């Protein structure tokens, strides 16, 4: 488009020269202005760049103006937002000669009707990253997207500006919702959509040698309907009476901010899947974190606890109701009567009085009394800073139970002088009733002994079908003797610290997307973070309290272990004067990172992984360790192995695609002259201890020269140092970025064509919600 130049020029009559003088005449051309643009039209609310050319003057600057919309000093037109097309005029005026200008007519085109063009969504799979971008046409950008009705799957979020659905779904099903888009002119459009999430852990499926859970609990609020009446219990009211009188389908609200002291027995009623009883704070849902979001003590008015990760409170208003156990011993404040079923708890603080004696379980079943269908949702469950409290919730004897989006703190036992030796945030696996399925999802779990433990007591059955996902398992460093701000028992003795996650009796367990931080030795254990040890222990006068106990079909994947004395302990071993348990094996461990494993800093054993059999029968077998990125203590082995040569060999051992620090003694014996690993030569150890085995495509970083490649099984790698591997950021194996650079020699070098070591992207997607 070219505009005609404006004519604002003038001429000057030359003076008359004296006689005999030659005069040169100077004629001044008028200043001319022209404007141009790449188009004669622009969309509603759009932009169009204009250019001005000024002739016959050294000052080529112009002033811009427009009849509608706005235009910058550089000539960029911002068109008005119009509902019908119309013409506007753009003017460029010479600064040197304000009478000289040029104009251009531009058609502003009305936007097409706003419409969402996305009408179907691709399906997703639980546990796998999902991404989909919604599209719209017409209207005037930018767009803003919201969910108008319905809900997204847990783990999926809508980004309002980008219109993208992303995250890692944790529950299968078909989710129906309506999405709304609004343009900058405040026009709106809606579209009904359905997102189908398939279950990657359907009944009968496997991860390597391990069978995955056969049953998964659906625990959304929509899955626990309570269509009955609501009863409110205010401060000073009778909560127990409300429990006793509630009908199936009712809701009991406890006054937000109020304290309800006592021991409350949750009674048996003939409820069903369509008629749950909900017990919750009276605060509205808008005062709590959204469903699927972890609660913190902020919602009980506590801005921060010493030594814990930041709560990042947006406010500290107390909107929770508190149940507090006032007894001097025993368990409480919540006990389930025999047969109690279909109860959901939301937005409550559950605790005990300080300064009292040892308390066992804050939440649990009555002794030898089964319960079922229990959901703890957005709860703060905690002991006190110095007192002994054994467990937050005890799941033994409970079936179909879930702990979701909750916060557990201050469960600990005092060393030497204490009344207990093991404390857990969540425990189970004892007693004589069927147990499971369980769902432990998106919680902060803190305890001195084991953050999560299944087993360790008398039992005739094994809990099964256990889903443990996207939790943060944490021990405060202020519990470590000698650490600044040390906190111990009332007498100053330290708390007994053992590990983060231990199984002594469990089967079909999926442990995925979890963050494990801080554990140390110095007590009865050696600071391993993860322990898989089936136990038929001595309890009381019984020396074989659980011959039926087993740990089988365990999948550990897409998780991180940091700040520990040792990594993973896999052992079938007799201990505590007990006997041989029923079984241990079929473990799939893959895509896990282990860093800051330091035996000196955390007072413990040091090996990255221990694999040991101490039984003459029910031999350990079916172990797959694949795609691990791990940096153990440099003075300890990457793999410690043990089995007496009088026992059958351990079977079906797979160790592939791992990227680990070799250590001073890369593959070493767990001890004893009759140990199959006594030679400590890697090839000899592997072939003597395991049959059959697969041991290929592993990179052992900084292997000592003594352990030359000829002393190893074939087809493995020996990078001289971490720099040779080409991590994105090794950071001395402390919180680094363990992606491989594109030029790494171990890029796509695995048996499956993937990078050696863990899939860092997959881990990050899984643990995003765990922090």
Predicted regions and their residues:
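Short glycine/proline-centered coil/turn motifs in the loop regions
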Residues: 55-58, 67, 137-141, 150
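Strand-loop-strand motifs at the edges of beta-sheets in extracellular beta-sandwich domains
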Residues: 71-82, 150-170, 178
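C-terminal edge beta-strand
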Residues: 102-109, 187-199
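Right-handed parallel beta-helix/beta-solenoid
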Residues: 198-248, 256-258, 278, 283-286, ...
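Acidic, glycine- and Ser/Thr-rich low-complexity intrinsically disordered tracts
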Residues: 202-229, 297-310, 314, 318, ...
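Beta-solenoid repeat scaffold
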Residues: 221-226, 248-255, 261-322, 337-346, ...
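Right-handed parallel beta-helix
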Residues: 276, 341-352, 370-384, 399-414, ...
